Regions:
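Basic, glycine/lysine-rich polyanion-binding surfaces/domains
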Residues: 1-130
């Protein structure tokens, strides 16, 4: 799936008529609601419902392959996908290719389990929590 982005906002296509907007701009939700007709659009703030883990480095795709069935050799910058990591439903977004950087979104209630699964997958290559 494709991602559209600029310097402050990323829009991830998440399925038919469904997008995830990721931004540090706190006003974006207000701006979107002003421009969208309430009769034809629903905008929901998911800020507090998701956990985000960002992975960066040369081995990121190899690490993700350990828990996710996606063909990462075809995954490119500004691609996103819905999948699973060790049984946890996730959305993956490739935000940079130099160095390779991915954001993984999961429901907040699965955040700790996802963190442990990802760090276990990183043990061979090492990791640094920030």
């Amino acid at each position: 799936m494709h991602v559209n982005s600029n310097n402050e906002t990323r829009i991830l296509w998440n399925g038919p008529n469904n997008w995830i907007v990721v931004s540090k701009n706190k006003e974006i939700l207000i701006n979107i609601k002003k421009k969208c007709d309430d009769k034809n659009f629903a905008v929901t703030d998911l800020s507090h419902s998701r956990t985000v883990i960002e992975l960066k480095g040369n081995s990121v795709k190899e690490i993700l392959k350990k828990g996710c069935p996606i063909n990462f050799s075809e995954f490119k910058l500004n691609n996103c996908a819905n999948s699973v990591f060790h049984g946890i439903t996730i959305t993956i977004d490739m935000i940079s290719d130099s160095p390779e950087t991915f954001r993984i979104f999961a429901l907040r209630s699965f955040g700790e389990s996802l963190y442990h699964s990802v760090t276990d997958a990183c043990l061979e290559d090492g990791y640094r929590g920030i």
